[in-house]
Amino acid sequence: MNKSTNDKINKAFFNMRIYLVIFLSIIIPVSGQELSNQKKKEIFEVDRLSSKGPNAAPDRRKDEGKGPYKRLVIRGGTVIDGTGGPPRGPIDIVIENNKIVKVQDVGYPGIPIDESKRPKKGDYEINATGMYILPGFVDLHIHTGNQFKAPDAEYTYKLWMAHGITTVRGVALGPTEWALNEKERSAKNEIVAPRIYVYDRPGNGADWKGGPINDPETAKKWVRYAKKKGVDGLKLTSPRPKIMKALLDEANANKMGSVAHLEQKGVAEMNLIDAARLGLKNQTHFYGLFEALYKNNDVQPWPYDMNYNN
């Protein structure tokens, strides 16, 4: 077979593949996607409610918790410190102005404690004899909810607190201004809630006038805007590499945190190794990690019927 004939055959097969792909793209999506009007209304209602933030937590009642105290002492507990070491005790813990200042061994199990060697008396004391003491848990990926699911932030906060979570990183906690206000109220002990760190998505903010984040300079302007508002860090997806670099450069220069859900829409240009090299601090979910492990950092072999929006 001469070269000319071979080229014609290859071209014919190439065109056939194109027609086949177009044909499949026409007929495949039609199957099984007819929705009733009622179902469409339900979907639109869920979308409408999901776009609205939750109700703010009510002010703390007088019977909800005690303190803070100038000097709080927790006495005689067995501590699990979270480092991987074994439990130990009895231990006295001294907290002054909401800060742990001393963790002191005061004896041995089953042997009377020498009171003269214990920390001095506190304004308020808790007898933790026979109890275990752990540091508060930190949840690095939380959302409060919305008007469709978990519409009351009070419920969410108290659920976290009841499970020992005393610090949270919202990614995002809720709408920007709402989240910053809840962060401030928590810091002032005006509400029953964990300590809150606010991470936000580029372009968010009711008074942001810079438009969509479509170029590196706008990306940097938004980071400076967010920093000024009191945002603690960035919640990213997988923007184009130049924009990702600009966001991370400016965030790191302003001592802000960063976390990314490297969604599959952009993972061909930005896997986890790429993002880490640009200065990303944390990853959430696992998108971008597996692609970084592929030979030559390839992307997954998507099924022909995959639809990212499904």
Question: Model-derived features: where do they sit?
Answer:
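Short active-site segment of divalent metal-dependent hydrolases/proteases
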Residues: T144-N146
